[in-house]
């Protein structure tokens, strides 16, 4: 499981510098560099009433430090200009969730996180700017589920979890070198179902940040630059992906059968897929795709224990799906969001995958080969919008 997140961080570290590449120079120098300190107040979101058996309080402090690299008009990058000069940031944070008061016999742990972030300023007026931020990284939790010592903490099932955050920052330039910001974030911690139980945690956070620029930042302005060529029209993506899934239904069956049910063996998930996407601008493409999936499972055994009978429709490790995908492009990097429907599945009576799924991820497109352009990527697949299913690593070709 830990190996999978290290692979994810390696892929992010390799692909994100593409966002910071300019036509004439790199942004990884002192003239582009800045450092930040921030603090936030985090509140556990409990819309489903899941924390009532564990928590007495819901608020915790967070503090962090960042090192950022801002793109500038003088970089002469069409991509940076098109996205209104985004910024690439690397950060470390401490979330004192271990300070939450809990019921006797259980505890929540602190989170120590490292991450990479993309900051965008979609609105500017004088010394004020406003825009979204996306953070992706890994968190070390000081406390996780244990069937004997911490049975109520079904939210964190492993020591290392993914850290995914999204938010909005309102920034005020108070000096050529100094900036302050008011921030609002949504924060999610999950291990992608590599080990159960893994209900994950969701938090809302508000705070403030102080940033110091090593060099006075340039006045951000849209300039006229030569547009790069791009492959307009229909493009095909052929890919395969794999990951693992530790099933909570299997855990329930094992516990009902008298076993501890921890840890539950992670089982293989694999797929092959084809997408046809229409690239109608340098920044956007939209498409449709089909996938054939394989899932190692214990569906029949789970039903016999939990339901007392087999599913008359039978069982199959294979299932199929169709999906709609929206891509956002930045040089060789693309981000995508997919919404799909399972067209065939035989998962039994106890398993509840639902009919629909969601996928969010990124792909880094390698230099072109004679036939097409290879890419490496990752996806987080979910059901019911908030149920993690699998962290998938993919490889494919675009032509």
What are these regions (language model features)?
Residues 21-32, 74-86, 123-130, 173-178, ...:
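Short loop/turn motifs that connect adjacent beta-strands in outer-membrane beta-barrel proteins
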Residues 31, 59-65, 84, 106-114, ...:
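Residues that define the transmembrane beta-barrel architecture of outer-membrane proteins
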Residues 33-37, 86-90, 130-136, 164, ...:
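Transmembrane beta-strands of outer-membrane beta-barrel proteins
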Residues 39-45, 71, 92-98, 136-144, ...:
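Transmembrane beta-strands of outer-membrane beta-barrel pores
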Residues 43-64, 101-108, 246-272:
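Surface-exposed strand-loop-strand hairpins of Gram-negative outer-membrane beta-barrel proteins
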Residues 83-144, 210, 280-343, 364-370:
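Gram-negative (and chloroplast) outer-membrane scaffold detector with strong preference
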Residues 202-223, 362, 387-399:
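Outer-membrane beta-barrel "beta-signal"
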């Amino acid at each position: 499981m830990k190996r999978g997140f290290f692979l994810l961080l390696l892929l992010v570290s390799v692909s994100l510098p593409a966002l910071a590449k300019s036509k004439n120079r790199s942004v990884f120098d002192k003239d582009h560099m800045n450092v930040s300190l921030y603090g936030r107040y985090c509140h556990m979101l409990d819309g489903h009433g899941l924390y009532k058996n564990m928590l007495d309080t819901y608020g915790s402090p967070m503090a962090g430090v960042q090192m950022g690299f801002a793109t500038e008009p003088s970089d002469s990058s069409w991509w940076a200009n098109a996205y209104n000069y985004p910024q690439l940031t690397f950060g470390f944070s401490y979330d004192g969730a271990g300070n939450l008061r809990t019921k006797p016999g259980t505890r929540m742990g602190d989170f120590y996180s490292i991450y990479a972030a993309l900051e965008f300023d979609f609105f500017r007026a004088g010394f004020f700017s406003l825009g979204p931020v996306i953070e992706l990284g890994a968190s070390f939790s000081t406390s996780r589920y244990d069937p004997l010592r911490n049975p109520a903490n079904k939210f964190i099932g492993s020591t290392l979890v993914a850290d995914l955050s999204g938010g909005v920052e309102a920034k005020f330039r108070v000096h050529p070198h100094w900036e302050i910001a008011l921030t609002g974030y949504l924060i999610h911690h999950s291990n992608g179902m590599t080990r159960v139980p893994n209900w994950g945690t969701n938090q809302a956070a508000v705070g403030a940040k102080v940033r110091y620029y090593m060099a006075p930042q340039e006045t951000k302005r849209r300039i006229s630059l030569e547009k790069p060529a791009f492959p307009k029209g229909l493009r095909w993506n052929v890919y395969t992906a794999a990951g693992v899934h530790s099933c909570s239904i299997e855990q329930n069956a094992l516990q009902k059968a008298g076993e501890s049910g921890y840890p539950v063996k992670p089982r293989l998930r694999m797929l092959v897929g084809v997408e046809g996407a229409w690239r109608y601008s340098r920044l956007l493409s939209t498409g449709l795709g089909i996938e054939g999936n394989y899932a190692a499972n214990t569906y029949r055994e789970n039903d016999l224990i939990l339901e007392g009978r087999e599913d008359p429709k039978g069982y199959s490790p294979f299932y199929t799906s169709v999906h709609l995908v929206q891509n956002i492009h930045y040089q060789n990097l693309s981000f995508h969001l997919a919404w799909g429907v399972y067209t065939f599945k035989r998962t039994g009576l106890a398993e509840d995958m639902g009919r629909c799924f969601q996928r969010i991820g990124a792909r880094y497109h390698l230099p072109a080969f004679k036939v097409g352009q290879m890419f490496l990527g990752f996806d987080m697949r979910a059901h019911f919008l908030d149920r993690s299913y699998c962290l998938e690593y993919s490889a494919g070709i675009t032509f």
